[in-house]
Amino acid sequence: MKKVLFLLLCTALTGCSFHTISNVSQQTIDVHVRVSDWQYTNMIDNNYFRCVIDMPEITSHVFNQGEVQVYRVFNRNTADAFKHVLPDVFHQKEVLNGETFLYTTTVDCLYGIGWLEFNYRVSDFVYDNGNYGDFAPKAMDFSIVITKSY
């Protein structure tokens, strides 16, 4: 019993270690995506809109040891402004030509070294027939927070 207790005590005291990062800096970049910036992918069974931007701030160091957090900003520059962390999922109801559509819109992002891609998807592929104009994304604002650790 003493051996088991001794082994548990040794494991508990030496098994965990903490690495403290003492130098951290953050940078916030505001991005406005215009309606004309969204590109329709038109891929079979995976249709969505996307907007790719250059992000030289996402270096290999940030990619491997830092963090990138993206927020969608609503009502920017107003007293009612608020942010929502991506992914951003909203349930929608829309009536077009007397027909009711229930669907979900999702805004998310991908990033790599030097770039960031915003994606806008509508559930159930409601624009599979090529008539996606009514479901195209509007202009959107985003805040990108890049955290670097040294």
Question: Positions of the model-derived regions?
Answer:
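First exposed extracellular module after export/assembly in secreted or surface-exposed proteins
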Residues: 25-150
